[in-house]
């Protein structure tokens, strides 16, 4: 199967769910805090209080030995944590579309996490790189950028992405979408301007690909955020209201 990146790129060039109130129970997959220690900078660790990575690992039910895809990983904050969590018997794919690489190369791309010491379980995946085999992943994770897929690829490209994620997961596999919450009914222009997205739209689109909404975490919700500011506005940056949705592939 083509990589998730490749499937998303094909979407570029080829052209309210009631269950949203579900709250995940206390996780049975308790994360070990030592996964936050190895191979992470002081700068990254300083962000842990706001990003709550242990709660994220528990919600995503990450375990040693799993295969995890970190889709659009940015500087690799979660890639490193996943690498530590799945351990030497697991695999992490850091999946960045070629279009994104081309878009940001003039600004300087972060060095690949796979090149860091102790990261032999991390593999970089781009549109022309090695591919993730069909039905192999336990988890596909995307953080604060599902809205970007909409901005760059539109509804068709987003649907292609969701289908490729579904195909890449094992039966029973998990797709987690974490993003900045937008107002109900936020349109494409508002999405592009504010870098937010309506949670209900995400649920509608992902379940349309065959997924079941399996849980929601509220640990990053912020009722003080009125959803009207750009996420980069100093008044709200790092403190936006964020939804975290767990979808499961049947099986």
Regions found by a protein language model. Give the residues of each.
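Class I SAM-dependent methyltransferase Rossmann-like catalytic core
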Residues: 32-59
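Conserved class I S-adenosyl-L-methionine
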Residues: 65-74
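Class I SAM-dependent methyltransferase SAM/SAH-binding core
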Residues: 75-131
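A short glycine-rich, Lys/Arg-flanked "PGG" loop and its adjoining helix->strand segment in the class I
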Residues: 83-84, 156-171
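A short acidic, Gly/Pro-enriched loop at the edge of an enzyme's catalytic core
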Residues: 130-140
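A short SAM/SAH-binding and catalytic strip from SAM-dependent methyltransferases
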Residues: 138-159
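Conserved beta-strand signature within the Rossmann-like core of class I S-adenosyl-L-methionine
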Residues: 172-180
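Core SAM-dependent methyltransferase catalytic element
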Residues: 225-251
């Amino acid at each position: 199967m083509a990589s998730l990146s490749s499937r998303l790129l094909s979407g570029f060039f080829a052209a309210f769910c009631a269950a949203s109130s579900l709250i995940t129970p206390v996780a049975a997959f308790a994360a070990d805090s030592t996964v936050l220690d190895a191979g992470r900078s002081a700068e990254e660790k300083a962000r842990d209080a706001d990003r709550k990575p242990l709660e994220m690992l528990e919600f995503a039910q990450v375990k040693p030995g799993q295969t995890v895809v970190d889709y659009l990983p940015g500087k690799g904050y979660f890639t490193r944590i996943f690498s530590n969590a799945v351990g030497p018997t697991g695999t992490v794919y850091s999946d960045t579309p070629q279009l994104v690489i081309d878009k940001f190369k003039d600004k300087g791309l972060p060095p690949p996490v796979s090149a860091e010491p102790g990261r032999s379980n991390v593999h970089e995946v781009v549109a022309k790189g090695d591919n993730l085999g069909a039905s192999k992943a336990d988890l596909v994770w995307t953080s604060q950028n599902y809205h970007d897929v909409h901005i760059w690829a539109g509804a068709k490209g987003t649907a292609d992405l969701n289908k490729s994620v579904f195909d890449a997961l094992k039966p029973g596999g998990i797709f987690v979408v974490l993003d900045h919450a937008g107002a109900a009914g936020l349109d494409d222009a508002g999405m592009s301007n504010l870098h937010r997205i309506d949670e209900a739209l995400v649920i509608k689109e992902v379940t349309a690909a065959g997924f079941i909404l399996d849980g929601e975490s509220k640990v990053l919700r912020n009722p003080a955020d009125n959803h009207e500011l750009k996420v980069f506005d100093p008044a709200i940056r790092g403190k936006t209201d964020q939804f975290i949705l767990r979808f499961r592939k049947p099986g």
